[in-house]
Design a protein with these regions (language model features):
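Structural preference for beta-strand elements that scaffold enzyme active sites
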Residues: 31-32, 59-65, 94-99
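Active-site beta-loop-alpha junctions enriched in small/polar residues
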Residues: 1, 36-38, 65-69, 100-103
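N-terminal binding-site loop/beta-alpha segment at the start of enzyme catalytic domains
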Residues: 1-60
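Short, charge-rich binding segments
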Residues: 50-55, 71, 88-91
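Conserved short-loop catalytic and cofactor-binding motifs
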Residues: 6, 36, 67, 108-112
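Glycine/proline-rich, positively charged
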Residues: 10, 73-126
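Short, surface-exposed, polar/charged, turn-prone segments marking secondary-structure boundaries
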Residues: 19-24, 60-62, 89-92, 125-126
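Secondary-structure boundary/capping motif
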Residues: 44, 71-74
Length: 126
């Protein structure tokens, strides 16, 4: 899928274009959609959620991620904010796959600080 940001418009999304692409994808049998809070300048989850919310929820799967880019998001509180925001932006009661973004970067020490010590792995496993 091409970048749905409108040319020369900052952070505006061509929602009509996103809707068209999602409708066409679903019609052709695509049922898995992967996104992240950081995609499309931070607007991907919202645009995808808007497009998919027009279809029955049992017809597709959503994958999104907990970001690993900004250390300011590593606390449990910030991680939970990111987690909850994904549900809101995606307009869904459940997310099929909650992935951990960029796990290998920084090695095990960074992984431990980002996902283990703040309890997010335990939370996601529940």
């Amino acid at each position: 899928m091409d970048d749905p940001n409108l040319q020369d418009s900052g952070n505006n999304i061509d929602q009509e274009g996103v809707n068209y692409l999602i409708d066409a994808a679903l019609e052709m049998g695509v049922n898995y959609f992967d996104t992240a809070p950081s995609y499309c300048r931070g607007f991907s989850e919202r645009a995808l959620g808007e497009a998919l919310s027009r279809h029955p929820r049992d017809k597709y799967y959503i994958a999104t991620k907990l970001s690993n880019f900004a250390r300011s998001t590593w606390s449990r509180e910030k991680s939970m904010e990111m987690y909850k925001a994904s549900y809101k932006e995606l307009k869904t009661d459940y997310i099929d796959y909650m992935l951990l973004h960029n796990v290998g970067q920084g090695g095990f020490d960074q992984f431990e600080k980002r996902y283990l010590k703040n309890g997010m792995i335990d939370f996601l496993a529940e």
